[in-house]
């Protein structure tokens, strides 16, 4: 069975799927256009199906107004709710910095420090998911 979750602006826009229980599935993907609209990535959005993927509803905008496109959202295996998804950003049109982000199940987004002077550093609060 094929079901369309959403569309995107680039064939390399990729995200991940979570199966919360037998019926509820979550997809987190860069499905909104980002600041570099012709390149891979964009703004990160959360989509949920409560009927095993038969239909999908946009439930939250995780990033918006970003400087660089976000992409390659990944689902950590056996992770806790404080580390629910992670991804990076970058400008696909030119050589640029790339930062790492992670998302908590309750909708908080954190950015990892770009420069680390010690082995351990605190993540930087980045934004909060806007629920739809």
Please tell me what each predicted stretch does.
Residues 1-132:
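Extracellular, repeat-based ectodomains that mediate carbohydrate processing or recognition
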């Amino acid at each position: 069975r094929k079901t369309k979750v959403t569309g995107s602006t680039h064939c390399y826009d990729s995200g991940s799927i979570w199966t919360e229980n037998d019926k509820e599935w979550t997809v987190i993907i860069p499905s909104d256009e980002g600041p570099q609209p012709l390149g891979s990535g964009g703004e990160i959005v959360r989509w949920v199906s409560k009927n095993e993927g038969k239909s999908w509803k946009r439930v939250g905008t995780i990033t918006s107004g970003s400087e660089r496109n976000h992409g390659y959202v990944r689902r950590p295996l056996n992770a806790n709710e404080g580390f629910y998804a992670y991804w990076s950003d970058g400008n696909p049109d030119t050589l640029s910095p790339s930062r790492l982000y992670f998302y908590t199940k309750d909708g908080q987004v954190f950015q990892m420090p770009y420069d680390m002077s010690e082995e351990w550093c605190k993540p930087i609060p980045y934004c909060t998911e806007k629920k739809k």
